[in-house]
Regions:
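Extended alpha-helical targeting/anchoring segments
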Residues: 1-400
Length: 400
């Protein structure tokens, strides 16, 4: 196994007190992200898999597996906690700051330079921020009932990141190294090589037959809503009253569906990625629960100094034939209601980017084009702006 960087270069960076990554690259023509995850994540809680399918048909370039976090951060309501001994699941301590300030500090301490040639997600923090984290940003009244009782947010800092590159057909196994005065550079590099070697050995083993068994046919379940049709209709009428009164101009009425499920959570992920592949597929394992999903859209992206929001609104089903598909696209783009809804979201997107972008840099780079996915097509636009130096990625997230 060949690792990078070389020992001399590693030692210089380590002596300078800078965090860095150590990595090895493998050929990936006999492995898939799912098979690798099944090999690597067994008996490794707090792991995750992120994949991408673009346009409903083409696999995105990168798939990412994260393992063995050294730090776990979580927030619930006005409180944030951090666990710096992640192998002890209950070793959380209060952050001593409000959640957004604590998160900004966690992001700052986790920053690490990624060498040219490695994907930008080769190290960092990963996880979810739930809908209720909006209460950290906006005053929207008292909290709703919380029958599920999950944290509003959880972010982990993996010590192993495995990146599939579908263009180069490679697997890059990365481990971050942070300087420790009690550990020499030679020992730190040896420990990093050992972590990488363990992952390479696990990838080399045969997949357990029980693990490799396909997730099966369609999962036939009867979902149950937490809202009756009559209750939902009353919500619609109340929303219309708020709009007429000028209190709101946009509202998303939602309901929760639940169903019994006796299979491993990863079986659900495998079914979703087959039935509804999308640009953002995610599986996050938090031991006591998992977060599984497939989404066509980003909330907001901050990459370098560019902030991006992609409004998606306006929907039609996919056609059974190419001719029907084209006809449905034309119908969608000619629908006044769908176009008005999309224009409203496009205006909101420009406004949101403008909250954190330098004056004069907000542009609509694409507008009113149609993206196709496995089951539906959407009207999509793209808004970009240059991040104002007074703001950071967390500000961009709050603006979005």
């Amino acid at each position: 196994m060949q690792i990078e960087p070389a020992a001399d270069a590693f030692g210089q960076t380590y002596a300078a007190g800078q965090a860095q990554v150590v990595w090895t690259t493998l050929v990936a023509d006999l492995e898939t992200p799912v098979s690798a995850f099944l090999k690597l994540a067994t008996r490794r809680p707090l792991s995750f898999l992120l994949e991408s399918v673009e346009g409903g048909a083409t696999r995105g370039r990168y798939s990412i597996i994260g393992l063995d976090p050294d730090v776990v951060w979580r927030a619930n309501g006005p409180n944030a906690e951090i666990n710096r001994t992640a192998r002890q699941p209950d070793a959380f301590a209060p952050c001593g700051a409000p959640p957004l300030a604590a998160l900004r500090a966690f992001i700052a301490e986790s920053r690490i330079d990624i060498p040219d040639g490695l994907p930008p997600m080769a190290a960092g923090i990963f996880g979810y921020l739930g809908y209720d984290t909006v209460r950290l940003i906006e005053e929207i009244g008292p909290p709703n009932p919380d029958p599920i009782g999950l944290p509003d947010a959880i972010l982990v800092r993996p010590t192993i990141v495995v990146i599939f590159d579908a263009v180069k057909n490679t697997i890059t196994v990365v481990t971050p190294v942070r300087p420790d005065q009690a550990v020499s550079a030679k020992s730190a590099l040896a420990r990093a090589a050992e972590r990488l070697g363990t992952v390479v050995d696990d990838l080399d083993r045969a997949l357990d037959k029980e693990q490799a068994t396909d997730a099966g046919g369609p999962l036939v379940v009867e979902p149950r809503s937490n809202t009756t049709p009559a209750e939902f209709q009353r919500m619609v009428l109340a929303a219309k009253d708020y709009i007429a009164a000028g209190d709101i101009f946009q509202v998303v009425l939602s309901q929760r569906f639940e169903a019994p499920f006796g299979l491993p959570a990863f079986a659900l992920y495998r079914a979703i990625r087959r039935i509804n592949p999308a640009p953002f597929l995610f599986y996050l394992d938090y031991e006591k629960f998992s977060v599984v999903g497939s989404s066509p859209e980003i909330l907001v992206r901050a990459r370098g100094d560019t902030v991006t929001i992609r409004p998606i609104a306006g929907t039609r089903p996919r056609g059974a034939t190419p001719h029907e598909d084209k006809a449905l696209e034309a119908e969608l783009l000619a629908d006044p209601k769908e176009c008005a809804e999309h224009l409203m979201l496009l205006d909101l997107g420009r406004n949101d980017v403008g909250r954190v972008a330098r004056i004069g840099t907000v542009t609509v780079t694409d507008q009113f084009f149609v993206e196709r996915y496995s089951h539906v097509m959407h009207i999509v636009s793209n808004v970009e702006g240059k991040l104002d130096p007074r703001h950071d990625a967390l500000d961009a997230l709050a603006a979005g």
